[in-house]
């Protein structure tokens, strides 16, 4: 009875042994490396450039800015600012200097307790009362916020200058200035631009002592204006201040500073032409988009997924250089850039850069501006001959 079972059993054993012998080769084929795929063909440069230009022209901050301006025009503190900020307006009647006119601002009530940070006590939105002339000025400012590269050509007259300045030094705040001994060279220029109220006392040998224009962003002014004893002209009464607006509600800080008793005889604070703001924003965004595509290999449309596109902004230094390009016959730039052994700012202990700026993209723009300005997008439509620009390190 056992004999008939031997042959089927032998066949089954043979099949099992064959399967076991072939399993390693099957396994190697199943888990082996995937076939190498051919790389994607590079995007046509002209097509890529057109995409970058199109995306750089998009402004996701326009809608919220429009809402903030509407709030101010209707006498309300903008919702984007009311939650965490307040403006300590000095007195019941203030003046905002804008476009060479004075515009009164009225309000009811005040903050009698100066021991408390006014940022913790926002003004009730219904208490802000703007003069009709101020409403017209704000409306005009927002209406001018459009792309017009020709604004560079008109900067001397917009800034009430008698003509172009022979030579300008734009002094940044990088720690690379320490030990550079550029002070005398900086002061030898016809005009010296400084950024964001950077301190010069004690640093004159490296950063110079002369100041002809103070260029600041409105966040810096806001931090000063919220303090009861703020003096908005740290370089002296005779040094004009040119300010670009980061939030529409910061116009109230301009009013506060211009109306303070210590500023009555000082040079007024001027606001940058919004067309210049738009031009600077487009240039920097273009270079940021280009850097993103080159470094990641991803589509330019994905740039906004890595940044807060509505908050993305150029730096104060970048716009100061653009102003110099528009009003100076020769531009020298100091204190821009980084070094491993240098502080972020020569005058402070700030450790890191702000995320809303793309400094590497701005450095790429500076290289093109100095070496081949004809390739800078949007700038080549300004209708001006870009003056020589030299960066000192």
Curated annotation (Swiss-Prot):
Domain of life (superkingdom): Eukaryota
Membrane topology label: Single-pass type II membrane protein
Subcellular localization, as worded in the UniProt entry: Golgi apparatus membrane
GO molecular function: sialyltransferase activity
Lumenal side: 28-393
Keywords, ordered alphabetically: Glycoprotein, Glycosyltransferase, Golgi apparatus, Membrane, Signal-anchor, Transferase, Transmembrane, Transmembrane helix
Principal cellular location given in the protein's record: Golgi
InterPro entries linked: Glyco_trans_29, GT29-like_sf
Gene3D superfamilies the record matches: Glycosyl transferase family 29
GO cellular component: Golgi membrane
EC number per UniProt: 2.4.99.-
Protein's recorded name: Sialyltransferase-like protein 1
Species of provenance: Oryza sativa subsp. japonica (Rice)
The encoding gene: STLP1
């Amino acid at each position: 009875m056992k004999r008939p079972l031997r042959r089927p059993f032998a066949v089954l054993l043979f099949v099992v042994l064959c399967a076991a012998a072939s399993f390693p080769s099957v396994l190697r084929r199943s888990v082996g490396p995937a076939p190498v795929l051919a790389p994607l063909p590079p995007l046509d440069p002209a097509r890529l450039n057109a995409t970058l230009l199109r995306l750089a022209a998009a402004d996701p901050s326009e809608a919220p800015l429009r809402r903030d301006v509407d709030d101010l025009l209707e006498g309300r503190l903008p919702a984007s600012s009311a939650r965490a900020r307040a403006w300590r307006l000095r007195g019941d009647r203030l003046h905002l200097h804008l476009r060479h006119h004075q515009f009164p601002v009225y309000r009811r009530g005040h903050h009698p307790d100066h021991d408390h940070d006014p940022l913790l006590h926002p003004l009730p939105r219904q208490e802000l009362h703007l003069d009709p002339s101020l409403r017209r000025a704000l409306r005009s400012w927002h209406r001018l916020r459009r792309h017009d590269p020709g604004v560079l050509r008109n900067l001397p007259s917009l800034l009430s200058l008698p003509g172009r300045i022979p030579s300008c030094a734009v002094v940044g705040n990088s720690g690379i200035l320490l030990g550079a001994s550029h002070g005398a060279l900086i002061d030898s220029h016809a005009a010296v631009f400084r950024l964001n109220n950077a301190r010069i006392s004690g640093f004159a040998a490296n950063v110079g002592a002369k100041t002809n224009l103070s260029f600041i962003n409105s966040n810096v002014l806001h931090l000063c204006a919220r303090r009861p004893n703020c003096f908005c002209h740290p370089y002296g009464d005779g040094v004009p201040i040119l300010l670009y607006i980061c939030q529409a509600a910061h116009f109230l800080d301009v009013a506060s500073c211009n109306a303070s008793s210590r500023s009555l005889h000082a040079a007024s604070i001027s606001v940058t032409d919004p067309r210049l703001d738009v031009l600077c924003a487009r240039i920097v965004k273009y270079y940021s988009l280009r850097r993103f595509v080159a470094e990641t290999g991803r589509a330019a449309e994905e740039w906004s997924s890595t940044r807060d596109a509505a908050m993305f902004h150029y730096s104060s230094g970048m716009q100061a250089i653009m102003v110099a390009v528009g009003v100076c016959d020769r531009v020298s730039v100091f204190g821009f850039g980084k070094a491993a052994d240098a502080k972020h700012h020569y005058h402070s202990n700030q450790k890191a850069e702000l995320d809303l700026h793309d400094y590497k993209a701005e450095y790429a723009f500076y290289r093109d501006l100095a070496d081949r300005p004809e390739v800078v997008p949007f700038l080549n439509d300004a209708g001006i001959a870009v003056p020589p620009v030299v960066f000192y390190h």
